[in-house]
């Protein structure tokens, strides 16, 4: 597993875990990964998360499925990456599927959804799209 872009690696682990119908996936923990996971849990895309270990922290992510065993996350895509950062002001924040999906944004007030960023009148770095 390449650690050139740890956020993209986390999103790939989530995507692959849902394709493999896993209940939980594990990724190395960091502050930004915990914040992104918290937003996805609040928006209902993931079931739960917890940080394991006291020396080397691991982020345990519980995946969420519909009753028909179909993953709740249909599409998850990394937008801003280390080689090409993508920043938008509050007026230019994109909408995913006309508001049906979520854009995760890293702002000066923390990691949040595009809807919350618009409400707080802040822009920031577009981390990923989730639908």
From Swiss-Prot:
Gene3D superfamilies, alphabetized: 3.30.1370.30, 3.30.1490.10
PROSITE patterns given in the database record: RIBOSOMAL_S8
One BP term from GO: translation
InterPro entries reported for this sequence: Ribosomal_uS8, Ribosomal_uS8_CS, Ribosomal_uS8_sf
Origin superkingdom: Bacteria
GO molecular function, one term: rRNA binding
One Gene Ontology cellular component: ribosome
Keyword entries, A-Z: Ribonucleoprotein, Ribosomal protein, RNA-binding, rRNA-binding
Function statement: One of the primary rRNA binding proteins, it binds directly to 16S rRNA central domain where it helps coordinate assembly of the platform of the 30S subunit.
Family under the similarity heading: Belongs to the universal ribosomal protein uS8 family.
PANTHER family, alphabetized: 40S RIBOSOMAL PROTEIN S15A
Subunit structure: Part of the 30S ribosomal subunit. Contacts proteins S5 and S12.
Protein's name in the database: Small ribosomal subunit protein uS8
Gene that encodes the chain: rpsH
